[in-house]
């Protein structure tokens, strides 16, 4: 009998063996086997040496933005982004490298103490409480079983979305961006035919506008459902269920016997379809490494702002030619149905779920019940789920002035877009006498400006990559796009107010859309990346704060836009918004120069990448 066979026979009831030399991936022997000969099969796992060769150290890095929100106290955050030769990393090996909950807790405490020196006394108290919580959560009682083996992607793994062919990843990126356009289109589809709502239900314009606003409100609440669903079951399941419900609830919208039924169903349509807004960015990020995902994310930044513009553009013609409100929703349902089928055909991109399935397959093949992901090993923390999806976003909204200021600007731009949907009917409908179909055509310049901005984002991304090669980047390096776009958004409103005269050809006010479309996409693209980099440790929660505030603004603005233009007249209505937009131009420039100091002074804690030891 060979030496190796002797080891196998002797360790037939053990799940792991220690590789003393640490030169090659060690081997474990499963306690059970499914083979006909009932022979145990040696399976390689990683050693300290092999992990160190891959760059793993005793310090745990910041989890990727797409790491599960429901996981907590990770000792191996690299699991979802790293490829290893064997695809299995024993907890015992990680613990021998110092990756234990208690050791990482001590490191975290030092980081908190360093950050406290730049904070107010209130901030210090907050950090002391968090430090206590960290010690309690990461006590020795919560150390993982050393016999557990975490599953990772193997080197060159075809299951890893990062390894899919480039054309496949970009095809999925375009399709997912169209899904976002579909959802955003649905929110504004009725804005091209509000007269049909008034006529059918015998209500005023204010009541009809609610059919648009309530769906946008649904956008702010839906992520509370779909983010945890995505964490637990994957993107594909979330898209299939949510978009299926969205398609179904368009039927009662089309057949609603009264306004109350229509408004209730529109709100639920917003809740169901919001998965497209809160998950697609993650799906795109799943397919690209952090170094190259910026250009792909630019498509996601483009989509939610172009989608609503297509609504009045298409449905203005339906309203004028047929006068049927129900046809608007049938068309919306058809669009949503097509995207439901397409999104369901896109394979799962979420690494934690892919690895869960891989772990289940390996458990079955080897008979080793201790192969799992770290999320499975720790279990789903409902308290952390609520904290990440609800409590922490609300906490950020009242304690993080930098985040609130940034979100306010995003909210303003998004709100101005929805304001355009109701300002253009006043300007081109009441002043120029155009019908809804021609009013819808006036939104084309916004689309052109947005396409121009999409091309410009590639320039911004290339400049950022140049900075990355030269030095360690800061969150403020992400603000180039906002500095370019901010003046254009304000200029658009000044043009709109200055050209809203009947004796001036329609090209004057319509051209404002070019500048606004260009500025709005650049601002959103830039500030979205800035938020992620400033709050990298809790990026999902910070983005949830942004989605909530943005949707609230988008829902509120349509309710008073028409009245504002009637009370202040066409010029001062636009100029009032122009004054606000002009004042906000200073924000990206101020943050670019003083952002780091402001974050350290005003934030309760430094959540950026700078605060973490790599």
From Swiss-Prot:
One family name in Pfam for this protein: MFS_1
Question: Cellular component terms, GO, for this chain's entry?
Answer: cell periphery; fungal-type vacuole membrane; plasma membrane
Region listing for Disordered, in residue ranges: 1-40, 99-144
GO biological process entries: spermine transport; transmembrane transport
Compositionally biased residues, Acidic residues: 126-144
The set of disulfide-linked cysteines is none
Q: Give the modified residues of type Phosphoserine.
A: 50
Query: Where would you find the membrane-spanning parts of this chain?
Result: 174-194, 207-227, 237-257, 267-287, 298-318, 327-347, 408-428, 438-458, 479-499, 504-524, 542-562, 575-595
Query: Which Gene Ontology molecular function entries are recorded, alphabetically?
Result: antiporter activity; spermine transmembrane transporter activity
> What's this protein's family per the entry?
Belongs to the major facilitator superfamily. DHA1 family. Polyamines/proton antiporter (TC 2.A.1.2.16) subfamily.
This protein is called: Polyamine transporter 2
Q: Which gene encodes it?
A: TPO2
């Amino acid at each position: 009998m060979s030496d190796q066979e002797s080891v196998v026979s002797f360790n037939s009831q053990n799940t792991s063996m220690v590789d003393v030399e640490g030169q090659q991936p060690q081997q474990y022997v499963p306690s059970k086997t499914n083979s006909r000969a009932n022979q145990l099969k040696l399976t390689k796992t990683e050693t300290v040496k092999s992990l160190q060769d891959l760059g793993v150290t005793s310090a745990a890095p910041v989890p990727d933005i797409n790491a599960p929100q429901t996981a907590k106290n990770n000792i191996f955050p690299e699991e979802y982004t790293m490829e290893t030769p064997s695809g299995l990393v024993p907890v015992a090996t990680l613990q021998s490298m110092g990756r234990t909950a208690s050791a990482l807790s001590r490191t975290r405490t030092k980081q908190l103490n360093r950050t406290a020196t730049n904070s107010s006394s209130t901030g210090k108290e907050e950090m002391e409480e968090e430090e206590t919580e960290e010690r309690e959560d990461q006590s020795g009682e919560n150390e993982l079983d050393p016999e557990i083996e975490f599953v990772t992607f193997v080197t060159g793994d075809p299951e890893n979305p990062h390894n899919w062919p480039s054309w496949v990843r970009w095809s999925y990126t375009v399709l997912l961006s169209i899904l976002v356009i579909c959802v955003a289109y649905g929110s504004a589809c009725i804005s091209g035919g509000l007269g049909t709502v008034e006529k059918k239900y015998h209500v005023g314009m204010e009541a009809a506008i609610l059919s648009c606003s309530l769906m946008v409100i649904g956008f702010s609440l839906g992520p509370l459902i779909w983010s945890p669903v995505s964490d637990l079951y994957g993107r594909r399941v979330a898209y299939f269920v949510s978009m299926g419900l969205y398609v179904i609830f368009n039927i009662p919208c089309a057949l609603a016997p009264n306004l109350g039924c229509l408004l209730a169903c529109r709100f639920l349509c917003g809740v169901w379809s919001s998965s497209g807004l809160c998950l697609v960015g993650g799906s795109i990020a799943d397919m690209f490494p952090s170094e190259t995902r910026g250009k792909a994310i630019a498509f996601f930044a483009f989509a939610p702002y172009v989608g609503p513009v297509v609504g009045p553009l298409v449905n203005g013609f339906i309203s004028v030619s047929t006068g049927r409100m129900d046809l608007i929703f049938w068309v919306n349902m058809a669009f949503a149905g097509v995207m439901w089928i397409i999104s369901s055909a896109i394979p799962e991109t979420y690494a934690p779920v892919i690895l869960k399935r891989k772990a289940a397959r390996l458990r079955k093949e080897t008979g080793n019940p201790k192969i799992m992901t770290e999320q499975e090993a720790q279990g789903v923390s409902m308290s952390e789920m609520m904290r990440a999806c609800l409590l922490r976003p609300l906490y950020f909204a009242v304690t993080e002035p930098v985040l609130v200021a940034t979100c306010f600007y995003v909210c303003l731009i998004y709100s101005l877009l929805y304001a355009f949907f109701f300002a253009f009917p006043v300007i081109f409908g009441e002043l120029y006498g155009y019908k809804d179909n021609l009013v819808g055509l006036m939104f084309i310049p916004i689309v052109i400006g947005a396409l121009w901005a999409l091309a410009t984002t590639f320039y911004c991304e290339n400049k950022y990559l140049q900075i990355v090669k030269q030095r360690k980047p800061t969150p403020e390096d992400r603000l180039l796009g906002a500095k370019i776009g901010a003046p254009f958004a304000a200029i658009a409103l000044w043009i709109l107010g200055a050209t809203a005269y009947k004796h001036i050809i329609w090209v004057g006010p319509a051209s404002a859309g070019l500048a606004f479309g260009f500025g709005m996409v650049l601002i959103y693209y830039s500030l979205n990346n800035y938020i992620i980099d400033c709050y990298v440790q809790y990026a999902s929660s910070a983005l949830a704060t942004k989605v909530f505030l943005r949707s609230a603004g988008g829902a509120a603005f349509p309710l008073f836009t028409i009245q504002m233009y009637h009370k202040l007249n066409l010029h001062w209505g636009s100029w009032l918004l122009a004054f606000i937009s002009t004042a906000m131009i200073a924000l990206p420039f101020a943050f670019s120069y003083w952002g780091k100091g402001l974050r350290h002074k005003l934030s309760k804690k430094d959540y950026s990448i700078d605060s973490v030891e790599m």
